[in-house]
Amino acid sequence: MKTQAMEKINLVQAFTTFSDYWSPRVAGDINTSQIKLAKFKGAFDWHHHEHEDELFLVVSGTLRMHFRERDIDIEAGEFIIVPHGVEHCPEALGDECHVVLLEPNTTLNTGNVTNDRTVHALSRI
């Protein structure tokens, strides 16, 4: 059984440890899910996740989640859950957006799409 030390993580400090965009970092594990930190800039790619729901918690900036039928803006301190199978395209409004993701550890950042933004091996904070 995998155990993890009980340590607090300062989100503001953790976001200063990396600078690349759209490349999530694992900050912690909860059973079969992971807490990931990511910096978003501009728009990502349209995609969906066949089996995984995703939670996007905005720490700073504004995230616009595009869906085929509408857009939803998520401000700092707000979150949105995107159910599996729902096509979506995240976009950071303004300069950049810092986001905490809570999702199953099987979740590929680009979902059903494989391209140069796909991250197969995630780094840890």
Which positions does each model-derived feature cover?
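Double-stranded beta-helix
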Residues: T3-F15, G28, C89, L93-I125
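A short glycine-rich, His/Asp/Glu-containing loop-to-beta-strand
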Residues: L11-W46, E52, P104, G111
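Short, surface-exposed charged micro-motifs
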Residues: V26, L55, R64, D71, ...
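A cytosolic small-molecule/anion-sensing beta-strand core signal
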Residues: N31, V59-S60, E75-A76
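Short, conserved beta-strand element in jelly-roll/cupin
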Residues: K39-F40, H49-F67
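Short beta-turn/strand-loop junction motif enriched in small, turn-promoting residues
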Residues: G42-D45, R70, G85-E87
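Short glycine/serine/proline-enriched coil/turn segments at secondary-structure junctions
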Residues: H47-H48, E91
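Short acidic-glycine-tyrosine-enriched beta hairpin
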Residues: R68-H84
